[in-house]
C-alpha cells in the first residue's frame, strides 16, 4: 500500500462534497500536470490511502482521509469541449489525462494546517513535497513515516 496527499480547493470540491457523493466516492478529475498525472496513472493502486488537503483557502491543511477506490482510467473531461478541463489535444483513442476514483474514509478530528506541518519540515516531515518552498503539485507521494507522524 502507498500513501498520497491530494489537494483541492474546498469551494470547488471539498471533503464535504465527497461525503455527499453516492457511496462517498467520486472521480478525481481535472489533473492537468504531467508529474501528478504520472503518479495517478502509474503508481496509485486501489486501497492506497490519501490525505485530503484543502488548498487556496483561509487556512490550508489536511482535513481528512480518503482512499483510492478505482485505479487510473482516462479523464473524460479532457474530451468534452464544454468541460472546464477540456484539452483539445487529448484524444480518446490515445488519452493524455487520467483520473482515479477516491472514496471518503473520515474527517480528521482537527485540521492540520500547512503552518503546523511546516514546523516539522526539518524533522519528521523532512523531504515531504508539501512543506518544500514552491511545491504546487496537486498530487504527491507521502512516505509511510510521514503518514504515521
Predicted features and spans:
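A cross-family signal for N-terminal binding/gating loops and helix N-caps
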Residues: 1-15, 61-62, 81, 85, ...
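Short, charged beta-turn/beta-strand-edge "cap" motif at the junction between a beta-strand
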Residues: 53-60
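A broad, low-specificity signal marking well-ordered, structured residues that form hydrophobic/aromatic
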Residues: 3-4, 26, 99-100, 137-140
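Compositionally biased, charged N-terminal/linker segments
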Residues: 1-46
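Aromatic- and Lys/Arg-enriched surface recognition patch
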Residues: 64-137
